[in-house]
Amino acid sequence: MFIQFRLPKYITSLIILLLFYSCNKESKLIWEDNFDGTDLNEQIWNFELGNGCPDNCGWGNNEKELYTKNNHKIVDGHLIITIKKEDSVYTSTRITTKGKKEFQYGRIEARAKLPVGKGLWPAFWMLGSNISDVGWPMCGEIDILEYVGREPKTVYTSLHTQNSHGNTINSKKTLIEDIEQGFHIYAIDWTKDKIDFYVDKKLVYTFSPQDKTTEVWPFDQPFYILINMAIGGNFGGFEIDDTVLPQEFIIDYVKV
């Protein structure tokens, strides 16, 4: 037996609204690099070279590495950054999208495989595009992924602002048993009100301050992406295990 009935108009309107909202929550891919070429695409990426001197020796953190163009390669659709010790110098690679690809809001994501060893400090992060005008930390910094080899099975997600004087008070340390094994996905969902941090699609931290002044929330402007592997320093740790070198930080893709 067929029974015909009608939903009240307000319920019908609510269902339509929810369906509309659900459809519009689907993210739209606006840019990606799958590292499918034979070398890094320098129309997208810049190399930052040297040790930060003379203005920012040790990259502001007493790091020990010297960045070169020679410590990266593209193999089978992966960007591989290698850190090694050459004579008494640690060499690595640091790349950015500054001035070429800059983003404001959305989902920023990378799939990566971490290196292992004391002193190592790989990172996938962002800086405010106005850094040359206002300096750091006024420009803001978003650390989507930081890993330090002295703390196995642990990843950091952090923010730096003028209000924190650059310190990582807006930070979360997440214990993940298999983080050094295979590839994992590191991402943020960034809106005008908050930044959600994810590891393997699991929410691990949210930053959503009520105060949206520039000192607390410089995240209302374009940012650019950085990928690097540091060694030693204030956060990486001053105990470095040379016996594990060389080590590789492998990135499968970056998507926005």
Which residue stretches match the model-derived regions?
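GH16 jelly-roll
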Residues: 24-256
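Bacterial Sec-dependent N-terminal signal peptides
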Residues: 1-26
